[in-house]
UniProtKB/Swiss-Prot annotation:
Species per Swiss-Prot/TrEMBL record: Chlorobium phaeovibrioides (strain DSM 265 / 1930) (Prosthecochloris vibrioformis (strain DSM 265))
Protein name (Swiss-Prot/TrEMBL): Small ribosomal subunit protein uS19
InterPro entries named in the record: Ribosomal_uS19 (IPR002222), Ribosomal_uS19_bac-type (IPR005732), Ribosomal_uS19_CS (IPR020934), Ribosomal_uS19_SF (IPR023575)
Physiological role: Protein S19 forms a complex with S13 that binds strongly to the 16S ribosomal RNA.
Record PROSITE patterns: RIBOSOMAL_S19
Taxonomic classification: Bacteria, Pseudomonadati, Chlorobiota, Chlorobiia, Chlorobiales
GO terms assigned for molecular function: rRNA binding; structural constituent of ribosome
Length: 98
């Protein structure tokens, strides 16, 4: 369920302040953040934000298409290693018996 429109988007105050400060100075550094729930505002476009996924910080370059989404959507927290495929690794299934 989306957030109410009368409340407005949730943007981490410290993160927004750092981005606005970098915009005024014209810098482009990687910003580390643990705030996955923060919404991406148009001020973030062009910056690289390292979003924590529970283990490491994943660098996310913010483009125009990402505005309105949350930072956590672009830093997956789970790694998929595939299903147990013992037969597939050995070269196929066992031959059928008649």
């Amino acid at each position: 369920m989306p957030r109410s429109l009368k409340k407005g988007p949730y943007i981490d105050i410290k993160l927004e302040r750092r981005v606005l400060d970098m915009n005024s100075r014209g810098e482009k550094k990687v910003l580390k953040t643990w705030c996955r729930s923060s919404m991406i505002s148009p001020d973030f476009v062009g910056h690289t934000i390292a979003v924590h996924n529970g283990k490491t910080h994943v660098p996310v370059y913010v483009s125009d298409n990402m505005v309105g989404h949350k930072l956590g959507e672009f830093a997956p927290t789970r790694t998929y290693r595939g299903h147990a495929g013992g037969k597939a690794e050995k070269g196929g299934a066992a031959p059928k018996r008649k």
